[in-house]
From Swiss-Prot:
Pfam families: AAA_lid_8, ATPase_RavA_C, bpMoxR, LARA_dom. The keyword Zinc-finger does not apply. It comes from Salmonella heidelberg (strain SL476). The lineage of its organism: Bacteria, Pseudomonadati, Pseudomonadota, Gammaproteobacteria, Enterobacterales. This is Regulatory ATPase RavA. Its EC number is 3.6.1.-. Its main location: cytoplasm. SMART domains: AAA. One of its GO terms (molecular function) is ATP hydrolysis activity. It is found in: Cytoplasm. CDD domains: AAA. NCBIfam families: PRK13531.1. Component of the RavA-ViaA chaperone complex, which may act on the membrane to optimize the function of some of the respiratory chains. RavA functions as an ATPase. Keywords: ATP-binding, Chaperone, Cytoplasm, Hydrolase, Nucleotide-binding.
């Protein structure tokens, strides 16, 4: 087997070649290529004339030797038009019921069926067997069919509770396409002279039959790590608990996991990663409502849980809470405490300064900076006699903010623990302390916990950086995940700086 990174590069180049001349269809081509390389089916939903059939024709060129079959279904389509006409010779000479399948679906590797829901029951029943078992019953014999990719298309969804639901459930990847939107792309499409029948893929990139068969075995060997399974199970539980969530059969879950394995394999990895789970948004929806619902649920999973974002924020909240508890304990120890001297018949308590406050001018530190008189204040200088008078009789108290300028009036009080508290205009308060009494505002316990959390965040970010090179995931998703991780990192850094 080729080196994983070389294989990933080759598949990327193969996809680029297939996308050439198709505008705003890169994601559809890539997912159809992934389906073809893993033997799955695709349903394309969209209005006529948006290159649905061209996408299917292009996929034939991904392989060195691949035959294609395409057919536009109508209400009058017959099995003979899809699976081949009956052999009159065999019926006449030997009495055998046998179809001539050359050039029809049973001998094609790439199959495109347009307006699929217009097919009759006879076609649908045979098609179900072909998709499920990759076998076709031709008269008395079961013949293996080589189909690698079935692309079915329609401009409408099947009716609910109809006989079409069984076939719809077999379409693993479901893509909703629209006409070209970007102005520049629209112009390029109009003036393009590319022949749609030309093969845009160099022979060196095309997949041989031997490679294809070997890759099917290799895909099955890709592991599903426990953390990734837990994410999948979480998503399943979320969907089960939502009233309008689509029903997802066990069969569809199993086939979807194989698609995730294929995504990992063709991205050069030996295990499914959280990034691969984004593909589930194209596998688990049923209609427009469930498509939006799946987008929302996958975004919650990817930006909140896949790289432990929410778990890290929860841990950070616990660390911050613990830090506040320690700071409160430290605040009680270091706060400037006055001595209560209230008399028996006094309506308000009187206070005196403690013995250590003996200087004529006292500088007291704010345990937390406040904005007072339009100034960020970290300490206040008091005249000792003025402070003693205020403690005894109350009234107005003034102090120099940061020790400079004129003494300014202050909103100050003595709390129940006999600590001096100063408040700003919004009544936010902080206690005052003597210089040298305050200790390090970041306890060693908290500092260590924040460092550990930051290291864990770096590991998660590194994991994401290593996994994000996935051809089959749109770059918009990568941007949202990166933003969610950066938000967590920024909150951790802010906590470290406080």
């Amino acid at each position: 087997m080729a080196h994983p990174h070389l294989l990933a590069e080759r598949i990327s180049r193969l996809s680029s070649a297939l996308e050439k001349g198709l505008y705003e269809r890169s994601h559809a081509i890539r997912l159809c290529l992934l389906a073809a390389l893993s033997g799955e089916s695709v349903f394309l939903l969209g209005p006529p004339g948006i290159a649905k059939s061209l996408i299917a024709r292009r996929l034939k060129f991904a392989f060195q030797r691949a035959r294609a079959f395409e057919y536009l279904m109508t209400r009058f389509s017959t099995p003979e038009e899809v699976f081949g006409p009956l052999s009159i010779q065999a019926l006449k000479d030997e009495g055998r019921y046998e179809r001539l399948t050359t050039g029809y679906l049973p001998e094609a590797e790439i199959v495109f069926l347009d307006e699929i829901w217009k097919a009759g029951p006879a076609i649908l029943n045979t098609l179900l067997t072909a998709i499920n078992e990759r076998h076709f019953r031709n008269g008395a014999f079961e013949e293996k069919i080589p189909m690698r990719l079935l692309v079915a298309a329609s401009n409408e969804l099947p009716e609910a509770d109809s006989s079409l639901e069984a076939l719809y459930d077999r379409m693993l990847i479901r893509l909703w396409l629209d006409k070209v939107q970007d102005k520049a792309n629209f112009r390029s499409m109009l003036v393009s002279q590319q022949d749609e029948s030309d093969n845009p893929v160099p022979a060196s990139l095309q997949v041989s039959d031997e490679e294809y068969q070997q890759w099917q075995k290799d895909i099955g060997a890709i592991s599903l790590p426990d953390p990734v399974f837990e994410l999948i199970f979480t998503l399943r539980q979320q969907l089960d608990n939502l009233p309008n969530a689509p029903y997802v059969s066990d069969r569809r879950w199993k086939k979807a996991i194989r698609l995730l394995q294929a995504s990992a394999f063709f991205s050069g990895r030996d295990a499914v990663a959280p990034i691969d789970l984004i593909l589930l948004k194209d596998c688990l929806w049923y209609d427009a409502q469930s498509l939006n619902l799946m987008q929302q649920q996958l975004e919650i999973l990817m930006t909140g849980h896949a790289w432990q974002q929410q778990a890290m924020l929860t841990r950070l909240g616990g660390i911050v809470q613990r830090r506040l508890q320690l700071q409160q304990q430290q605040s009680d120890k270091t706060a400037f405490t006055v001595i209560k001297e209230g008399g028996m018949f006094s309506r308000r308590p009187h206070y005196t300064l403690p013995p250590e406050a003996s200087a004529s001018t006292l500088t007291l530190l704010l345990q937390k900076p406040l904005k007072l008189h339009d100034m960020e204040v970290i300490h206040i200088t008091f005249d000792r006699s003025a402070l003693e008078l205020w403690l005894t009789k109350g009234g107005e108290i003034r102090g120099k903010l940061n020790g400079i300028g004129f003494a300014q009036t202050l909103n100050m009080e003595v709390d129940n623990a006999q600590h001096l508290v100063v408040r700003d205009i919004s009544l936010q308060g902080t206690r005052l302390a003597l210089p040298g009494a305050a200790e390090d505002s970041m306890p060693a316990e908290i500092k260590q916990q924040l460092e550990t959390l930051e290291n864990d965040w770096r590991q998660q970010h590194t994991r994401f950086s290593e996994q994000q090179h996935c051809l089959f995931i749109h770059s918009d998703w990568l941007g949202r995940i990166e933003a969610s991780l950066q938000d967590v990192g920024e909150q951790i850094r802010q906590a470290q700086q406080c």
